[in-house]
Amino acid sequence: MMANETAAKSTKSSPTPAVEPESKLKILALHGYRQNGDGFKSKLGSFRKFIGKHAELVFVTAPHIAPPLPDSEAGTEPDPAQRSWWFNKDDGTFKGTNKNGPAIGFEDSLKLVEKVWKQEQCCGLLGFSQGACFVGLLCDLSARGMTSIKPEFAVLSSGFRSGSLVHLNCYETKVQIPSLHIYGEADEIIPKEMSMALADTFTDPQILTHPGGHFLPAQASQKQTYVEFFRERLQFHLEAQEIENATAANSILVDDSGPAGNGVHDDDDDDDDSD
């Protein structure tokens, strides 16, 4: 009898805490090649204002320093502000259109974003250019249970499929989560056909095009699309949290009415049920 009472008290003393609803989405934002987190944040000032009611962006800087540009003077030192998520050429550089190359440093970047994702408790992904390529890979890895990152949605601007050999099998199954794909009709760095090919790896991609080049647009003509996308994502996110809270509450009730007490508690347990 004493053993049963002790077990019951132990169960009730550490109930599963309810998850506090988040008022905004928390989105991990991945910059492009030769960018960094601070620079990307600065470039997205207008975009952040558009979505500020519904979402907060968490910017992270890639761990690898990109080498000097090919036309740099001899002896030029690498700029620590120019970063890369990985390198897909044997000379230690990156080019989105390169095919059948390596993915040097990819695992280091994967570990970094997994760490930040967990620390910041993010729920969605956003990426630009190489960062959007990375987002596409993360979505696929998540679907196959190969990363701790579990995005509810993704936003990919000027994205493309990775041409690295180790990533070629990442696009065999379509990604199921909601996605918004943004690209410029006049993009000469990542042609729109490459962004369209990445969008085709998702089951129901939402497409937003603009007449410009290689950038994430944030003009009045795009505002409504952004607002509606993130408002809908927030609604689904909050509904999921409510279900999670209800499930946790039901679990606590089941514990409180376990076999030791059959729903009747001793006086010694009153402090556990004060709330």
UniProtKB/Swiss-Prot annotation:
It holds the Pfam family FSH1. One of its GO terms (molecular function) is hydrolase activity. The active site is at S129 (charge relay system), D187 (charge relay system), H214 (charge relay system). InterPro entries: AB_hydrolase_fold (IPR029058), FSH-like_dom (IPR005645), LovG (IPR050593). Residues 266-275 have a biased composition (Acidic residues). Its EC number is 3.1.2.-. Keywords: Hydrolase. Residues 1-21, 253-275 are annotated as: Disordered. GO terms for cellular component: cytoplasm; nucleus. Belongs to the LovG family. This is Esterase AAEL000016. The keyword rRNA-binding does not apply. Residues 7-16 have a biased composition (Polar residues). GO terms for biological process: response to retinoic acid. It comes from Aedes aegypti (Yellowfever mosquito).
